């Protein structure tokens, strides 16, 4: 095993505006971070570079919207002659910082086109007789993105009110109520059903004391006590009608706190759907943890894994976000995870 560890090597491959700058970057790289963000947040990459020759603060100085494509490659990571790749994607530069001494620069790029207004421009608009997929399609087109909708359900609405919100923020809000996650990746606006991802077989197993877990953090708090059920009640004064629904998940205890929601719905079915999805969203907070590992290209948002050896915290988890870092400390991966709900 020591020979394998000694032979380990990591390479960062970078294209800037379509030009391969891997070699010229190697001598000045301090560290590189790829954040595969949780749903609702943008993926990003960050480059920290030594700049004693003043190239990055001078002739190479980035401009907003410049494209950076990055890939992490590992060699001999688990056995001799093994090669693995983690394509991080293509990003657009949205910030640049320069400081010193010694002179260093930091370049950050995000997965959303920086000239798109869907993230920052606030709008007020009424959406009538619309489905979630149609709403997402409109937002995608406005940003120059392709819609990838991976969910069996496509909720419909008589009317939605967008009030002083960005298009992306409004879409995130509506999707979250339906238990559907939103991400922007590789020119796509992606919507997927988190519950379906939870059902997938674990992609890998981490065993305490056997796998390369450098540190771990688990815990619980009464502030995040799981609710046993959710009740939705809404009185529609225009129709003189009250909609009510109670959702109790399989295996719920006979006693415990009930989450109560008073939010606009237009049918009993919509009330039940809101109750189930709201309970999922709330109870996700009760089983969160974080792990720091030796670099692992398998770690990605949406992947399920099995933990063994952490006693009461053992079980199946979903990766919410993964941060991959390459630098003087080698290649490391940090993940934020939550226990799957199972319903």
Give the label of every model feature segment:
Residues 1-114:
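Assembly/oligomerization scaffold segments
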Residues 2, 104-107, 111-115, 149-214:
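Short beta-strand-centered interaction patches in the first periplasmic/extracellular domains
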Residues 17-19, 50-52, 73-75, 92-101, ...:
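Solvent-exposed coil/turn segments that connect beta secondary-structure elements
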Residues 32-63, 211-343:
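An acidic/polar, Gly/Ser/Thr-rich interaction patch typically located in mid-to-C-terminal regions
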Residues 45-48, 109, 123-148, 162-185, ...:
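Amphipathic, non-transmembrane alpha-helical segments in extracytoplasmic/periplasmic proteins
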Residues 46-48, 69-71, 90-94, 106-110, ...:
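Soluble periplasmic/extracytoplasmic beta-strand elements of cell-envelope proteins
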Residues 82-98, 125, 195-198, 318-331:
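Short, compositionally biased
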Residues 104-119, 331-343:
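Short solvent-exposed strand/turn elements
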């Amino acid at each position: 095993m020591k020979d394998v560890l000694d032979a380990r090597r990591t390479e960062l491959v970078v294209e800037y505006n379509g030009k391969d700058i891997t070699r010229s970057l190697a001598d000045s790289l301090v560290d590189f971070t790829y954040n595969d963000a949780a749903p609702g947040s943008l993926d990003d990459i960050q480059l920290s570079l030594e700049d004693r020759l003043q190239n990055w603060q001078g002739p190479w100085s980035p401009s907003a919207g410049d494209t950076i494509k990055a890939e992490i490659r590992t060699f001999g990571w688990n056995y001799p002659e093994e090669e693995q790749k983690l394509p991080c994607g293509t990003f657009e530069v949205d910030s640049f910082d320069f400081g010193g001494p010694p002179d260093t620069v930091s370049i950050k790029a995000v997965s959303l086109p920086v000239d798109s207004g869907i993230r920052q421009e606030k709008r007020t608009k009424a959406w009538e007789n619309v489905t979630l997929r149609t709403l997402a399609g409109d937002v995608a087109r406005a940003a120059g993105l392709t819609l990838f909708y991976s969910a069996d359900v496509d909720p419909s609405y008589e009317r939605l009110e967008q009030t002083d919100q960005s298009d992306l923020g409004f879409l995130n809000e509506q999707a979250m109520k339906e238990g559907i996650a939103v991400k922007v990746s590789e020119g796509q606006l992606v919507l997927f059903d988190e519950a379906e991802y939870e059902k997938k077989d674990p992609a890998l197993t981490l065993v305490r004391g056997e796998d390369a877990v450098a540190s771990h953090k688990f815990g619980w708090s009464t502030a995040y006590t799981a609710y046993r059920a959710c009740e939705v009640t809404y009185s529609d004064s225009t129709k003189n009608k009250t909609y009510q629904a109670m959702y109790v998940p399989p295996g719920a205890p006979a006693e415990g706190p009930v989450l109560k929601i008073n939010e606009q719905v237009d049918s009993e079915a919509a009330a039940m759907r809101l109750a189930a999805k709201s309970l999922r969203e709330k109870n996700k907070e009760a089983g969160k943890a974080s792990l720091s590992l030796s670099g692992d290209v398998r770690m990605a948002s949406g992947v399920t894994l099995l933990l063994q050896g952490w006693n009461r915290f053992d079980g199946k988890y979903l990766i919410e976000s993964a941060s991959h870092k390459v630098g003087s400390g080698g290649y490391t991966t940090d993940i934020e995870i939550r226990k799957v709900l199972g319903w």
